[in-house]
Curated annotation (Swiss-Prot):
The organism of origin for this protein: Bacteroides fragilis (strain ATCC 25285 / DSM 2151 / CCUG 4856 / JCM 11019 / LMG 10263 / NCTC 9343 / Onslow / VPI 2553 / EN-2)
Record-given protein name: tRNA pseudouridine synthase B
Enzyme class: isomerase
GO molecular function term, any single one: RNA binding
SUPFAM superfamilies, per the entry: Pseudouridine synthase
NCBIfam families: TruB (TIGR00431)
Family: Belongs to the pseudouridine synthase TruB family. Type 1 subfamily.
Gene3D superfamilies: Pseudouridine synthase
Length: 233
């Protein structure tokens, strides 16, 4: 393996790890193995700390391919709690409001999910890395400032209801770059005339890369020590 010339690695991001931590951890062990102090390493799409799943990491000259990977279709499995919202639309924040769910049936959920297939306009979460006048939205939101983000045009290719244990549902989503599943959960809750937030998220596929092809970052040190790695002079 030649990490300087460029390699593409697939990781299964663990729960609680930031995407930045996965990259830093991988870089540290590559540099250790190559006996170098620095190496260009980047990832092709952030996953929130509370999400797990496929993360593509590029090294050396392969970092030029990051944009190519970012445009690949992504597949997620999301667990959504109906009847309650949080400021971040996930478990990062406490519940801030509750809503009725008695009127929600499996049939209503399935009918509502169909309305999200195709091109949709989605307002990103205030707690996101989107920029507002040069500042990150989450920095402004954490300071208690009102954050107004413009809707983005996205494509949802598929939504499938996997489990329906009301007021909790589990869905599979195939979508385009830039889709916030947290925001999708929010919008599904509103469309059901209730509220909703994300309680679990797994990115199961990016392009053709599936979860079962991915390395566990916690075992990366052991894995890289068994590889034939090109050592820099």
């Amino acid at each position: 393996m030649n990490f300087k010339e460029g390699e593409v690695l697939y990781f299964n991001k663990p729960l609680g790890w930031t995407s930045f931590k996965v990259v830093g951890h991988a870089r540290y062990h590559m540099c250790r193995r190559m006996k170098v102090k620095k190496l260009k390493v980047g990832h092709a799409g952030t996953l929130d700390p509370l999400a797990t799943g496929v993360m593509i990491v590029c090294t050396g000259k392969a970092t030029k391919r990051i944009e190519e990977f970012q445009y690949h279709t992504k597949e997620y499995v999301a667990t959504i709690q109906l009847g309650a919202t949080t400021p971040s639309y996930d478990l990062e924040h406490e519940i801030d409001a509750t809503y009725p769910t008695e009127h929600i049936t499996r049939e209503l959920v399935e009918k509502t999910l169909k309305t999200f297939v195709g091109e949709i306009q989605q307002i990103p979460p205030a707690f996101s890395a989107c920029k507002v006048d040069g500042a990150r939205a989450y920095d402004l939101a954490r300071k208690g400032q009102e954050v107004e983000l413009k809707p983005k045009l996205l494509v949802i290719d598929e939504i499938e209801l996997l489990e329906c244990n009301l007021p909790e549902i589990k869905i599979r989503v195939v979508c385009s770059k830039g889709t916030y599943i947290r925001a999708l959960a929010r919008d599904i809750g509103e469309a059901l005339q209730s509220g909703a937030h994300l309680t679990g998220l797994i990115r199961t596929r990016v392009g053709d890369v599936k979860l079962e092809q991915c390395l566990d970052p916690a075992k990366f040190a052991e894995w890289i020590d068994q590889q034939d790695v090109e050592i820099s002079d």
